[in-house]
Amino acid sequence: MTAQQKVNLLGLSRPQMEEFFLTMGEKKFRAQQVLKWIHHHQADSFEQMTDVGKALRQKLSEVAEIRGPKVTHESISRDGTRKWVFEMDNGGAVETVFIPDGRRGTLCVSSQVGCAVDCSFCSTGKQGFQRDMTSAEIIGQVWQASRAFGPRRNLGQHPITNVVMMGMGEPLLNYDKVLTAMRIMKDDLGYGIGKKRITVSTSGVIPKMNQLSEDLDVSLAVSLHAPNDELRNQLVPLNRKYPLKDLMAACKRYSKNITHRHNTITMEYVMLRDVNDKPEHARQLVKLLNGIPVKVNLIPFNPFPHAGYERSRKNDILEFHKYLNDNGVMTTVRTTRGDDIDAACGQLVGQVKDRTRRSERWKESIFHRTEQTDDNTAQTQ
């Protein structure tokens, strides 16, 4: 059996790992042993698994592997932010960012090689789209970051306390693989991260938002960026498929469905000078969010070459922030981190092959796939 045919155990959730061992004729408890070695001790070889018999280790080496994405570059910012560039098997690359903040350590994870949602202010979208990432490649970013920080002996003794699916790509357009990876993050045999500390950021793929609230009610962030459809159509093209009225209704449903105590949805709003930062935009935003438990996170735009946008003036950001808070909308201003290593929000680019043609094909497929999802949902109702 070639290396390409081997099962990569890094990307298997607990039920999948148990099924794998059952098909080998082994007991289910072997799954627990191997999961701990992989995710608690960051093992990359079966020979490291000293409580697994030699015969089984040999058998595993013939049919399986533990293989994460390859680290090709690491940068450390003056503020302590760390960025890794990971090479994919096909030659593309993605970027992953770790942001330390006191006792909290947040890992920003990518879900696709590139992105075809093509938000006009985001450098990732400018790079085009190549493919979805596998569950092993997604959880492999957490695994590799954990290896960089050293082995974890017990839960709670690890600098990664939070994970945000806010790296390259639209997570809900790679739903199944992202879901598997998040289940591994949440599992005590994986990384033991509570569901309220795992956040999925979406540009508004409504059918998958509805499904996520039923499958794994993690925290949700919505890339909003505009208070009306006309402007959001320009900034976030997916809005043409899922307009704000439908998106706000989906947010209300999600908030009602999640079971953990913190059911507030984060609304991400990048501040673009003279584009979406005027007083009338603040007034429209308050009206739009009325009745939805939200927190607005204002994000000063992080420039990149040929962006076509500028960061809002500091005073405009402060006035926008004040108006929202004064009118009952909890609002914060995100502190820019890692901009000196191009690790700030909207700056991740990685490396994508055949950018233009792949991106155009994927944009078409987004609308085709979401239409199919809508049709399937209608048939089941």
UniProtKB/Swiss-Prot annotation:
Domain Radical SAM core, chain residue ranges per copy: 101-339
Signal sequence extent: none
Active site: residue positions: E95 (proton acceptor), C345 (s-methylcysteine intermediate)
A Gene Ontology BP annotation from the UniProt entry: tRNA methylation
Cystines in this chain: C108-C345
One Pfam family hit: RlmN_N
The organism's place on the tree of life at top rank: Bacteria
Catalytic activity as recorded in UniProt: adenosine(2503) in 23S rRNA + 2 reduced [2Fe-2S]-[ferredoxin] + 2 S-adenosyl-L-methionine = 2-methyladenosine(2503) in 23S rRNA + 5'-deoxyadenosine + L-methionine + 2 oxidized [2Fe-2S]-[ferredoxin] + S-adenosyl-L-homocysteine; adenosine(37) in tRNA + 2 reduced [2Fe-2S]-[ferredoxin] + 2 S-adenosyl-L-methionine = 2-methyladenosine(37) in tRNA + 5'-deoxyadenosine + L-methionine + 2 oxidized [2Fe-2S]-[ferredoxin] + S-adenosyl-L-homocysteine
Cofactor info, note text: Binds 1 [4Fe-4S] cluster. The cluster is coordinated with 3 cysteines and an exchangeable S-adenosyl-L-methionine.
The enzyme's E.C. designation: 2.1.1.192
Main localisation: cytoplasm
Cofactor section: [4Fe-4S] cluster
Binding-site list for [4Fe-4S] cluster: C115, C119, C122
Keywords from the named record: 4Fe-4S, Cytoplasm, Disulfide bond, Iron, Iron-sulfur, Metal-binding, Methyltransferase, rRNA processing, S-adenosyl-L-methionine, Transferase, tRNA processing
GO molecular function, one term: rRNA binding
Record-listed S-adenosyl-L-methionine binding positions: G169, E170, S201, S223, L224, H225, N302
GO CC annotation: cytoplasm
Cellular localization per UniProt: Cytoplasm
Function as written in the Swiss-Prot or TrEMBL entry: Specifically methylates position 2 of adenine 2503 in 23S rRNA and position 2 of adenine 37 in tRNAs. m2A2503 modification seems to play a crucial role in the proofreading step occurring at the peptidyl transferase center and thus would serve to optimize ribosomal fidelity.
Homology family: Belongs to the radical SAM superfamily. RlmN family.
Other remarks on this protein: Reaction proceeds by a ping-pong mechanism involving intermediate methylation of a conserved cysteine residue.
Entry-linked NCBIfam families: rRNA_mod_RlmN
Identification of the protein by name: Dual-specificity RNA methyltransferase RlmN
Lineage: Bacteria, Pseudomonadati, Pseudomonadota, Gammaproteobacteria, Oceanospirillales
